[in-house]
Amino acid sequence: MLESEVSGNAPHSLWIVGAADICRIALECIPLPKRLLAIKVSGTWSGMPWAIPDNIQTLLTSTWEPKFDTPEDRAHFCDSDMVCVYKILGSPPNPLKPPEIEPPQMSSTPGRLFCCGKCCKKEDRDAIAIPVRYTATGKSRIQKKCRAGSH
């Protein structure tokens, strides 16, 4: 599913406990940017640890600690060489671009319809077209409104 068009940019949750090295291909197929929560435990599992590929930029790195029920649990965690890491990987998303507003067009066609609020009239001479927007005023009724002003 990760390699198909079905996934799109939908958020994914993928939990891997141990053996991240054999899940490397799945991890690398998740679209960027992605978040990574990891607990690195030294010497517990055999095999190669999965490392973030060099071509993936790390945007944020932070360490965290799990919640401990007793002081002994905290001491055991500190003595175990475990490291809890939170990272955001990948390129930041492109900021939304503001919509481009086209300048009014000059009309050289006589008799073109121009909007001037609720009343529309034909203009027989060259004029600047005023953009028209439509707003819903009821379930099936649509009313024209002029961006230039209200009449």
From Swiss-Prot:
InterPro entries: Herpes_US2_varicellovirus (IPR003485). It holds the Pfam family US2. This is Uncharacterized 16.6 kDa protein. It comes from Gallid herpesvirus 2 (strain GA). The gene is US453.
